[in-house]
Amino acid sequence: MFVHPQFDPVAVSLGPLSIRWYGLMYLIGFAAAWLLGRYRASRPGSGWTPLQVDDLVTYMVLGVVVGGRLGYMLFYDLPAFLANPLSLVQVWQGGMSFHGGFLGVLAVVWFFGRKTGKGFWGVADFTAPLAPFGLFAGRIGNFINGELWGKATDLPWGVVFPDPRAGGVPRHPSQLYEALLEGAALFLIVWLYSSKKRQSGAVSGVFCVCYGLFRFAVELVRLPDPQLGYLAFGWLTMGQLLSLPVIVFGLWLLARRAPDQNASQ
């Protein structure tokens, strides 16, 4: 059993400016994605320039932040949004949704593909290996904040979180499970898969299937958002429900892009 260290929510203070851990983790995730994107662009035959990566990551930041916040309010806290629409811009109060951010990124991919002539899948497959860095950093931010914990457990790595709502009992550190699976493991899988030429959309398909399965599995030991609870069967969460179409979409991509077709990465 471990006791959560109860970090100061403010990571850095520069006079009147305070940077919270969650925001810092997002910054680290985007910076890592940018560096990896530039590395991929530098490889011979990539078809990408460093400037294009700079532009893409800039648009991605907007897509993730706007989509993630809007998705959270619509999927997880709709009554609060309807009661106070201005809560949408109160990002400092927390509340970001991967699935909303995913939709925001899809919009960016479509726009950037048209803008550069690379096409939707050309941009999507290039972007897929970059995304796990942000997912990893975001989940570490959740753990530092002591939020989104799991169910009670007697496993030796259970963590006692400081929030009184956690009941003072050891719980699954579901944030770390997600960081390892949706971040580290997903990066390794997608990176290795993308190291060889694949059919258009295949890399994106692997990303969607693996992310959806990892998220669905961890949600089994993670407590649902208190304002929603379980949606059905005493275990189905909103995160699982939203992950199902992501998995189906990924499977469709892999089935649609047959291995014997011409590679177009």
Swiss-Prot record:
Name of the protein in its database record: Phosphatidylglycerol--prolipoprotein diacylglyceryl transferase
Binding site for a 1,2-diacyl-sn-glycero-3-phospho-(1'-sn-glycerol): R139
Top-level taxonomic group: Bacteria
GO cellular component, one term: plasma membrane
UniProt-listed InterPro entries: Lgt
Keywords in alphabetical order: Cell inner membrane, Cell membrane, Membrane, Transferase, Transmembrane, Transmembrane helix
Cysteine pairs bridged by disulfides in the record: none
Assigned EC number: 2.5.1.145
Top-tier EC class: transferase
Keyword Metal-binding: no
Organism per entry: Solidesulfovibrio magneticus (strain ATCC 700980 / DSM 13731 / RS-1)
NCBIfam families per UniProt: lgt
Subcellular localization(s) per the UniProt record: Cell inner membrane
